[in-house]
Amino acid sequence: MTIRNQRFSLLKQPIFSILNQHLINYPTPSNLNYWAGFGPLAGICLVIQIVTGVFLAMHYTPHVDLAFNSVEHIMRDVEGGWFLRYMHANGASMFLIVVHFHMFRSLYYGSYSSPREFVRCSGVVIFLLMIVTAFIGYVPPWGQMSFWGATVITSLASAIPVVGDTIVTWLWGGFSVGNATLNRFFSLHYLLPFLLVGASILHLGALHQYGSNNPLGINSYTDKIASYPYYYVKDLVGWVAFAIFSSIFIFYAPNVLGHPDNYIPANPMPTPPHIVPEWYFLPIHAILRSIPDKAGGVAAIAPVFICLLALPFLNQSMYVRSAKFRPIYHIIYLLFLADRLLLGWIGCQPVEAPFVTIGQISPFVFFLFFAIMPIPGRVQRENPNYFSENFAFSYPKK
C-alpha cells in the first residue's frame, strides 16, 4: 500500500485502526472450537439490549401510577412495541445464558490461569454488573412480582450491622418501596449497561494483551490466524443458531421465563403466595435460603463472587490448563456443573422437606469445589506422571 493510499485508508485512521487491530486482524489461535464463539456473542447480546432498551425508554414513564400502564401502552399501541419488549425481556435471559456458557467454557479450558488473571477478574466484575442490572431492570414493569421482589431483595441490606436500616431507607428513598425507588432503579438500569460496555472494553483489552487461550490450554505464539474472515464465518453458524433459539422464545413463548403475577399491577396490600426470582437469580437465592439466619444468608453471597475472583490464584496447574488433560479436575468440574444446575432447581422450590436439606448440601458442594481446586494441580506439579500412570484410560492409545 502506498503512502497516499494508506493516508486515505479508513482502517488506518486512529480510532478505526484500533478496531482493525482488535476486531479484524487480531491474531487468534488456529484451533479454536465453537465454544469460543460465546464471547463475541455476548457482545452482540449487549448491543441488542442497549438498542432495545433505549427505544423502550422513549415510551416508558417511571411513575408508580403510570409505569404499569406505560408498559401496556408499549405492548398495545406502539407499533412493534411488543417485539421490542419481548426482545429486551427475553434478551436478558439469552444474554445471561450466553455468559454462563462463556464462564463454564473458561473453567473447562483453564482460560483464567496465568497470565490471564485480569481477564478473569474483569469478567467477574462484568458478571456482577449484569446481575445488578438484571435485578433493577425487573422493577420498572411495576407488576406484583416487580414490587415484592424489590421489597424483599433490598430489605436484605438490613442484615448489615449498624448501618443496615439506613441503607435500606436510602435504597427505597423513603420508608417503603415507592415512586422514588422506581425512579432511581430506572435511572440506574439505563446507566449500568453503558458501564458494562466500558468494563467489556477493559475485558477485551486484557484478553488481547496476552492473546486468546486455546482448547489445548497451551501458549501458542506462532500458530495463529486473523480473526476476519475465518472466525467471523465460523461464529456465524453459532449466531444463526442463537437467533433461531431466541426467536422461539420471542415469538412463541415470550412469557415462559417470566412470572404471571407480574401482569397484575403492583399492590402493597396482598403478598404473592410464592415470591420467585428470575431463573438467573435462583442459584444465589438457593444459597441465601440455605442459612436460616438472615445475616448469615446475606454473608454467604459475598464469598460466591470472592471465590470466582480468586479462581486464577487457586489453580496450581501452571502449564497444563485444559480439563481434557486433567482427569481428576475433569471429574470435579462435572460435579461442580451438576451442583450449579441443582442450585438453580432448588432455588425455585418451596421451603419444605426434602428441598431444605438438599438446599443446604448444594451450597456446601459449591464452595467445596473452590476449596479443593488447588489439589489436582499441586499433585500434577509434584508428580507430572501421576495422571498418565493412574488414569491411562483418559488418553488415546498409540
Curated annotation (Swiss-Prot):
Keywords: Electron transport, Heme, Iron, Membrane, Metal-binding, Mitochondrion, Mitochondrion inner membrane, Respiratory chain, Transmembrane, Transmembrane helix, Transport, Ubiquinone. Belongs to the cytochrome b family. Component of the ubiquinol-cytochrome c reductase complex (complex III or cytochrome b-c1 complex) that is part of the mitochondrial respiratory chain. The b-c1 complex mediates electron transfer from ubiquinol to cytochrome c. Contributes to the generation of a proton gradient across the mitochondrial membrane that is then used for ATP synthesis. The main subunits of complex b-c1 are: cytochrome b, cytochrome c1 and the Rieske protein. It is found in: Mitochondrion inner membrane. InterPro entries: Cyt_b/b6_C, Cyt_b/b6_C_sf, Cyt_b/b6_N, Cytb/b6-like_sf, Cytochrome_b, Cytochrome_b_C_euk/bac, Cytochrome_b_N_euk/bac, Di-haem_cyt_TM. The chain crosses the membrane at residues 38-58, 82-104, 119-139, 185-205, 231-251, 295-316, 328-348, 355-374. Its cofactor is heme b. GO terms for molecular function: metal ion binding; ubiquinol-cytochrome-c reductase activity. GO terms for cellular component: mitochondrial inner membrane; respiratory chain complex III. Heme b b566 binds at H102, H203. A ubiquinone binds at H208. Heme 1 (or BL or b562) is low-potential and absorbs at about 562 nm, and heme 2 (or BH or b566) is high-potential and absorbs at about 566 nm. It comes from Daucus carota (Wild carrot). This is Cytochrome b. GO terms for biological process: mitochondrial electron transport, ubiquinol to cytochrome c. Binds 2 heme b groups non-covalently. Heme b b562 binds at H88, H189. It is a multi-pass membrane protein. Pfam families: Cytochrom_B_C, Cytochrome_B.
